[in-house]
């Protein structure tokens, strides 16, 4: 949805009548690469089409069949539904829901708030009756039958060295072609490895305006120091530092009037930081940036989830797994035996059984003082802090949803690889909503090269336990980006936290946030206890320990539900065709 004519390209097959490849979105492929993909697809090999550079929708039409798929991360998703004797599909779920007035799926929303390690999305969308095509799969139309969802070809597993060489090539392509395609290019320059690497690759092609955001809490941390050093030592960078104190922006500002907020297809964490994003993107908007490049997704593909230790054990690297579990316990400040016990339990438990245990756990009331434990990161699946807000009806809904995933879970044999994919899909959705908001409000297109299909595939082809090294931050980046970015950047060992800034925002915006929780639609549906959520909110407002991530997610979920009253109506998306509605092929 929403792709301009210039973002859509069609390539015909010279040897197969009626066969053509169409892409919509940020496809960075050359004419030669597209022709090679068409030739391979004509022979039955969709691999080259899947890995065309960029992040986009692809439709391969043979005349008798049509294969429709988004990117491998989920930035450009595909949704579909049956209606009026036909099949309708789109790259957004909201218009398909508006077609029939389908309501949001509140169990889906609860799952998004309360579960980790559960693939509850799979083929389920955020609206009832709307189905989702999982990233890495295609919606396949044959004649007039109901379409099939078919897995697309995936590449082989790689070693760190081989994957790093591939990453070096595809990431350079992803950034370089974006930089060359836009007249004016801007970048995020947080000072971290990810955004700094993207900035360095972009400025190798043309001068860029790089923006660093800071505030009173972050000004003395390493991010700003590294960003300034990058700007000073790498030629071609015009550096702007945006200080929240000057911009008068805090977390959760601007939420007093939900009807004035931008609409998104999914709940978006960006709604909780809108004025901060506005300040950060103001220089890009002012200069007419045609592409604002970010490092989003870098943490997902360059690093590894905590559960990589379990994958190492399952791959036969048992001593390595226990040593890394000991390191994990030290960082979490817990006894090593607790991490060892969870490691052993996870390796001994198949994923379907772990799901059923979680479903059984959620069916019963949680203790009043319950909070997720650090060792949950080593489990297949677990509940988040938001699970403590569920009512009996909410617990039943989530328990049933988790149980429904059990029959589909047998193919997963390693939790680290599963968490890699789920975390990547979540970040892809977040990026897509951020991009939609930035285009709506400030006219700035946001790019995340690390989320491109080819880039993510190169990284995730390496087992997660290979992408982690004790005492080495993002070892994959060190190997892949050597001599492309300054060596001292790749040896950075610190990461700035934003916790204190979040507390400041909660306190400053307490009245508006209290109103959002008090008017909770999930609570009105009997699924969530607003009093318990409000108690955690009050703790955060007072600067006491609180589940900040869960509160942020709940607030934006409630805002999303509020906006749907006008954003998901039929008239907002559809108008009658002169001769009646025409279903998509």
Residue ranges and their predicted role:
Residues 43, 47, 99-108, 410-423, ...:
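Structural motif
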Residues 64-67, 75, 155-393, 438-484, ...:
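ATP-dependent adenylate-handling active sites, centered on carboxylate activation for C-N bond formation
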Residues 110-118, 275-282, 422-433, 549-566:
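Short, hydrophobic/amphipathic alpha-helical patches that form generic packing surfaces
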Residues 306, 484-544:
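PAPS-dependent sulfotransferase catalytic core
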Residues 1-248, 526:
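Cysteine-centered catalytic environments shared across enzyme families
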Residues 14-22, 26-42, 63, 374-421, ...:
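Glycine/proline-rich, flexible active-site/cofactor-binding loop segments
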Residues 519-585:
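Acidic, carboxylate-rich catalytic segments that either coordinate divalent cations
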Residues 91, 106-107, 114-115, 469-491:
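Charge-dense polyanion-binding interfaces
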